[in-house]
Amino acid sequence: MFFYVLLLALMAQGWSLPQGKTGEDSPVFRPPSPPMGPSLPPPVSHDLHRPSGHPEEFRTGASLPPKETPNEPRHGRPKRDLHHGKVVPTGVPHHTGEVLHHTDCSSNTHKSHEENRPKGFRTGRPLLPIKPEHGRHRRDLHHGKAVPTGVPHHTEKFHNGSNGKSHPPRPGHSTSAHNDNSSEEKRPKHGQEQGKKH
């Protein structure tokens, strides 16, 4: 914007000469510039260390920024404020050289957390979710053909008859090895009448 105003001021000096004079008689001779559309500024050289592309009239007079020193950060930000990668603001203050908590640790006698914690007190840690493998937990998996049903599986105490409970025999399953003969005689066999006993 400043270049635009400066260009207009220079052009106004060139055009303000009287009609009869060509400008050669004036103490500073400037050739009339060709008409430039809507007053565009001259092309700017991006080489800041060699401003030879700028005519003296277009210089602003402002000094160039000083060369960078090793302690000076680039782009005006301190190096400690620069973050590399994705930074998510968490609201947690960053640790500095000072430790704000535990200011007087030497006077405190530390007790273990178990001694300070009342019974039934839970820690603030979230419990880890139990992820069953393939729908069932590893210790629930059976080796071999296991059909998951809602009925609890029978253990050895039901089959050895030590607790007094006995199960009716399954069809096609021999019960003589598991039960004694006296209990087998009391039960009627399949296909026999209830009134007849052996």
From Swiss-Prot:
Secretion signal, residue range per the UniProt entry: 1-18
UniProt feature, compositional bias: Pro residues: 29-44
Tissue expression notes: Expressed in the periphery of the cement gland as well as in the region of the hatching gland.
Domain of life: Eukaryota
GO CC terms of this entry: extracellular region
Ranges of Basic residues composition bias in the record: 76-86, 134-145
Record region (Disordered): 17-198
Compositional bias per record (Basic and acidic residues), positions renumbered to this chain: 46-59, 95-104, 181-198
Subcellular location: Secreted
Principal place of residence: secreted
Keywords associated with the record: Secreted, Signal
Protein name (database record): Protein XA-1
UniProt organism field: Xenopus laevis (African clawed frog)
Lineage, broadest ranks: Eukaryota, Metazoa, Chordata, Craniata, Vertebrata
